[in-house]
From Swiss-Prot:
This is Outer membrane protein IIIA. Attached covalently to peptidoglycan. It comes from Rhizobium leguminosarum bv. viciae. It is found in: Cell outer membrane. One of its GO terms (biological process) is monoatomic ion transport. May act as an outer membrane pore. Forms calcium-stabilized oligomers. Residues 1-22 form the signal peptide. GO terms for molecular function: porin activity. Pfam families: Porin_2. Belongs to the alphaproteobacteria porin family. SUPFAM superfamilies: Porins. Keywords: Cell outer membrane, Ion transport, Membrane, Porin, Signal, Transmembrane, Transmembrane beta strand, Transport. One of its GO terms (cellular component) is cell outer membrane.
């Protein structure tokens, strides 16, 4: 009896000491944070990881509207001005045992008017351990910073295989180029203004060229030597170019020699160009320049020709730029001409938005 009373008393005491609770409410679990986009800073700004991979992707491009002024700048009518619009856009990198593997695709869409539009593949190539193969621009596409120099190829975009060695600020490379849209024997038309005429043949025979490029920087001085041999035309060209910081600006000088009209250089037998890019203020750069070339009959037959010009770059506000250029060309045995253009551009590093993250870059010009 006593044991039963003790057990009942203990049970009553335990029940009294236990609080009465209602049924537990349903509480939603906190969502797991999801990392949609990860920044990839191994190759510079603008790259992000493709989700689920260790491959870095960069999406960039521009939209550009530009008005050109001159003698028939459009080439299809007698107008002295022409407006064109172009859109370009990507690059991808990943690490390999041989170093970074880079893949680049650049598409460009052009519109001269509502009925004259096209889309082209501007670049597409693979690059690893100094080897590059695909469609890309050659060293002959480089030039001085202004718009007066005429020291480059008419066509600089080729299907090529290239190896470029780099060490610090020095590089040296060799490329084999397909010159299918270059200058050909029997198709060259003399009597035109150098640098303003398309010397290419439509879907010409596959031609082969070999080019080299050497360049680098040393303090305030930068330099580049470029050469090319056009196998079918059996002619070649070589060019030297350098810049040095002097006073409030940068002085640039270039010279080029061509043994005959070829796909690497066809504007003149020889030419020299000089400019001085004056940094007037933090926002304003003024670049006067001069070009002089000897153009014999087997090139354009214009004799000696010279050109002077002025290019002005101005940063209106952050990421908003304006550019204007005017050029005057006076050939000895041809008519003089004046040309120029004006463009404004908005540049931004914001193409892709994610929570707390913005990726890519774009330029809008008009």
């Amino acid at each position: 009896m006593n044991i039963r009373m003790v057990l009942l008393a203990s049970a009553a005491a335990f029940a009294a000491s236990t609080p009465v609770l209602a049924a537990d409410a349903i509480v939603a679990a906190e969502p797991e944070p999801v990392e949609y986009v990860r920044v990839c800073d191994a190759y510079g700004t603008g790259y992000f990881y493709i989700p689920g991979t260790e491959t870095c992707l960069k999406i960039e491009g521009y939209i550009r509207f530009q008005v050109n002024v001159g003698d028939n700048p459009g080439g299809d009518n007698d107008s002295d001005w022409d407006a064109v619009t172009a859109v370009r856009f990507s690059s991808r990198k990943s690490d390999t045992e041989y170093g970074p593997l880079t893949g680049v695709i650049v598409m460009q869409f052009n519109a001269d008017n509502a009925s004259d539009q096209d889309a082209i593949l501007d670049s597409a190539y693979l690059d690893v351990a100094g080897f590059r193969a695909g469609l890309f621009y050659s060293w002959w596409d480089d030039g001085l910073s202004g718009e007066t120099d005429d020291i480059g190829s008419v066509v600089t975009l080729h299907n090529s295989i290239r190896y470029q060695y780099e060490s610090g600020t020095f590089y040296a490379g060799l490329s084999v180029d397909e010159l299918e849209d270059g200058v050909y024997q029997g198709t060259f038309t003399p009597g035109v203004i150098p640098g303003t005429t398309d010397f290419t043949a439509d879907d010409g025979p596959n031609n082969v060229g070999v080019a080299f490029g050497i360049g680098g920087t040393a303090g305030a001085f930068s330099y580049q030597v470029t050469g090319g041999w056009d196998v079918d035309n059996e002619d070649g060209a070589i060019r030297a170019m350098g810049t040095v910081e002097i006073g409030p600006g940068t002085f640039g000088l270039a010279g080029v020699y061509s043994s005959g009209p070829n796909s690497y250089y066809s504007s003149a037998e020889w030419a020299v160009a000089a400019e001085y890019a004056i940094k007037a203020t933090d926002k304003l750069k003024i670049t006067p320049g001069r070009w002089h070339g000897h153009v014999p009959e087997d090139f354009d037959g214009l004799g000696d020709a010279w050109k002077v010009g002025l290019t002005v770059d101005y940063q209106i506000v952050e990421n908003f730029y304006a550019k204007a250029s005017v050029q005057y060309l006076d050939p000895q045995d041809g008519e003089d001409s004046t040309s120029g253009y004006f463009a404004c551009s908005v540049r931004s590093n914001h193409l892709v938005d994610a929570p707390g993250l913005r990726i890519g870059s774009t330029t809008i010009s008009f």
